[in-house]
UniProtKB/Swiss-Prot annotation:
SUPFAM superfamilies: (Trans)glycosidases, E set domains, Glycosyl hydrolase domain, Starch-binding domain-like
Cofactor binding remark: Binds 3 Ca(2+) ions per subunit.
Biological source species: Geobacillus stearothermophilus (Bacillus stearothermophilus)
Task performed by this protein: Converts starch into maltose.
Assembly, per entry: Monomer.
Positions annotated to bind substrate: W126, H165, R259, K264, H265, G292, D362, R409
Cofactor: Ca(2+)
Protein's name in the database: Maltogenic alpha-amylase
Length: 719
């Protein structure tokens, strides 16, 4: 009995020591993939399937698309043999790395022929059939097996989905490639050249001005090789339904989420209606690629508006640009990094849903910008401890380099588990899993100069303090550092892996210390919660009856209650840190979610209840009054989706919709997501360049929205 008591005491003291000063080890066996919507504590690993690992050589040169494989791996735009089975075989490696979500490049059937010399759809972004798996990668059985095994290893699967376009074509050569051909589970639908009566594609030429919203969304992508990508018309009911069915099929096969390609290049109304239909099937995670449009550029507000209103989260290109400038080219300082953290925190309603990254398949790898591995380690440490969920491009932990496409898409060179980067990622993955401050917490700058950034993440009483010195030649004396860490001594969570040190804290002050050249130090504290604490509600948009996941702490093991705007929700499942509930039947609009457990209520978290199942509608107003440079036309109406008569155009949730486009001036149009089969009232207004508002005259327009996948509502401006 005395031995048992002593063992218990020693174990308790060791646990307390870990809480205050060291690393809580990452236990991959404790990971779970039960909640598709929840990625706050995850590390995402982005994989180009063809370039990861060849697990099945029998599909390298399939009969359906014979001759597209290059066994020498010297032709960078040919297939090189990676497949779904290869990803499955490397799940143990990914699990050891601490990965809890994999993001797969597009898996659906791609172009069966060459698009010019030695140019194939190896990357997956030239989809010809959205209902079949690409034969170089496997089949639906292979996909299902991968998803099942990933889930068994506590790893979620996000699939890249490409609804903007089909395949390459040349407007002056109908024999080139497949002419943009589209298939539905093997049945031919049409191509760019036999589309006169179908309207499956946009026929407005190629994009020349990428900052022009009309061109970017209603014209074709162009490729440096001299061809175009056939731009799909999401306003066409057949296409909208086809794409929606394809996305639903992926979810039905177990996908935990979708990364939606090129969301800035098709109308946002389709995005929102697609998200709604997917969320009705399952509480999954959706993230869109809105490339570029950083703060200060022409369409930055449109990106923010999209992220706040569409129900689709976005990849954080704003922060990515600054990360690469701060740690890569050194053209910006730590002040710029802190400023961007603050700006995005103010602009994005759900900043914790942003996906952060240092590089990806569309830009040069970090080590080709800066070959110093120490700076790579610093950049990784930042995204692994900052707000949002980090996405690590395959091979980064193996120090892969490579310039722009296609040279950033080399074959995975090794699966070495001893590299410093591998150890860094696996260790900080444990921190993300075990400390709610990283998953949900606020960010506060605690000490800064051009080279050093010390920031604190805090969620109630959980705290993580991070210090990064990007200067690999100079150390810095750190004094006057304040923190929310409790009194005590704290070891570096990374155990000195990146040159870090321990600290002592007394009454909110950190004893002076020297931060070594190039060093990264991480100190953390976590404790049990005495009251329910909501960190996240996901998805953050949907209709009554949908399932949503509430993540946080202190919910207890005895079921309490969850309310949406005071209306009690039915609980599906309840654990101490995760609750699943059904959205209650209540009025549409932004509402507050609250958890009550043990008679104590939580903090509030916003959720957007839709007015009903969504459909995307082309709203056109003809013969609008003359406008001048800087004037914009918006739509508002009597439902939250149209702003509830608001003239706020800031990009906040449920504000006025727009701005509209005018390729046929003075007629204006855009596509908005509204509840299907509902009678609505609406009006248009002009927001002049000086901020003044000019409303339409006359009575409100009244219309009943369509019940199908898409529709059109056209009115004339009332003078």
């Amino acid at each position: 009995m005395k031995k048992k008591t002593l063992s218990l005491f020693v174990g308790l003291m060791l646990l307390i020591g870990l809480l205050f000063s060291g690393s809580l080890p990452y236990n991959p066996n404790a990971a779970e993939a039960s909640s598709s919507a929840s990625v706050k504590g995850d590390v995402i690993y982005q994989i180009i399937i063809d370039r990861f690992y060849d697990g099945d050589t029998t599909n390298n040169n399939p009969a359906k698309s014979y001759g597209l494989y290059d066994p020498t791996k010297s032709k960078w735009k040919m297939y090189w043999g990676g497949d779904l089975e290869g990803v499955r075989q490397k799940l143990p490696y990914l699990k050891q790395l601490g990965v809890t979500t994999i993001w797969l490049s597009p898996v659906l059937d791609n172009l069966d022929t060459l698009a010019g010399t030695d140019n194939t759809g190896y990357h997956g972004y030239w989809t010809r059939d959205f209902k079949q798996i690409e034969e170089h990668f496997g089949n639906w059985t292979t996909f299902d097996t991968l998803v099942n095994d990933a889930h068994q290893n506590g790893i979620k699967v996000i699939v890249d989905f490409v609804p903007n376009h089909s395949t390459p074509f040349k407007a002056n050569d109908s024999t080139f490639a497949e002419g943009g051909a589209l298939y539905n589970n093997g049945t031919y639908m049409g191509n760019y050249f036999d589309d006169a009566t179908k309207g499956y594609f946009h026929h407005n030429g190629d994009i020349s001005n990428w900052d022009d919203r009309y061109e970017a969304q209603w014209k074709n992508f162009t490729d440096p090789a001299g061809f175009s990508l056939a731009d799909l018309s999401q306003e066409n009911g057949t296409i909208a339904q086809y794409l929606t069915d394809a996305a639903v099929q992926l979810v039905a096969h177990g996908a935990d989420g979708l990364r939606i390609d090129a969301v800035k290049h098709f109308n946002s109304g389709f995005s929102k209606s697609l998200a709604d239909k997917l969320y009705q099937k399952k509480d999954i995670f959706l993230v869109g690629e809105w490339y570029g449009d950083d703060p200060g550029t022409a369409n930055h507000l449109e990106k923010v508006r999209y992220a706040n209103n569409s129900g689709v989260n976005v990849l954080d290109f704003d922060l990515n640009t600054v990360i690469r400038n701060v740690f890569g080219t050194f053209t910006q300082t730590m002040y710029d990094l802190n400023n961007m953290v603050n700006q995005t925190g103010n602009e994005y309603k759900y900043k914790e849903n942003l996906i952060t990254f240092i590089d990806n398949h569309d830009m040069s790898r970090f080590l080709s910008v800066n070959s110093n591995k120490a700076n790579l380690h610093q950049a990784l440490a930042f995204i692994l401890t900052s707000r949002g969920t980090p996405s690590i491009y395959y091979g980064t932990e193996q120090y892969m380099a490579g310039g722009n496409d296609p040279y950033n898409r080399g074959m995975m060179p090794a699966f070495d588990t001893t590299t410093t980067a591998f150890k860094e990622v696996s260790t900080l993955a444990g921190l993300r899993r075990n400390n709610a401050a990283i998953q949900y917490g606020t960010t506060t700058q605690r000490w800064i100069n051009n080279d050093v950034y010390i920031y604190e993440r805090k969620f109630f009483n959980d705290v993580v303090l991070v210090a990064i010195n990007r200067n690999t030649q100079s150390s810095y004396s750190i004094s006057g550092l304040q923190t929310a860490l409790p009194n005590g001594s704290y070891a570096d969570y990374l155990s000195g892996l990146l040159g870090g040190n321990g600290i002592s804290v007394s009454n909110g002050s950190v004893a002076s210390f020297t931060l070594a050249p190039g060093a990264v130090s991480v100190w953390q504290y976590s404790t049990s919660a005495s009251a329910p604490q909501i960190g996240s509600v996901a998805p953050n948009m949907g209709i009554p009856g949908n399932v949503v996941t509430i993540d946080g702490k202190g919910f207890g093991t005895t079921q309490g209650t969850v309310t949406f705007g005071g209306v009690t929700a039915t609980v599906k499942s309840w654990t101490s840190n995760r609750i699943e509930v059904y959205v209650p039947n209540m009025a549409a609009g932004l509402t507050d979610v609250k958890v009550t457990a043990g008679g104590v209520s939580s903090n509030l978290y916003s959720y957007n209840i839709l007015s009903g199942t969504q459909t995307s509608v082309v709203f056109t107003v003809k013969s609008a009054p003359p406008t001048n440079l800087g004037d914009k036309i918006y739509l508002t109406g009597n439902i939250p989706e149209l702003g509830n008569w608001s003239t706020d155009t800031s990009g906040a949730v449920n504000n006025a919709q727009g701005p509209l486009l005018a390729p046929n001036y003075p007629d204006w149009f855009y596509v908005f997501s509204v509840p299907a089969g509902k009678t609505i009232q609406f009006k248009f207004f002009i927001k002049r360049a000086d901020g003044t508002i000019q409303w339409e005259n006359g009575s409100n327009h009244v219309a009943t929205t369509p019940t199908g996948a898409t529709g059109n509502i056209t009115v004339t401006w009332q003078n």
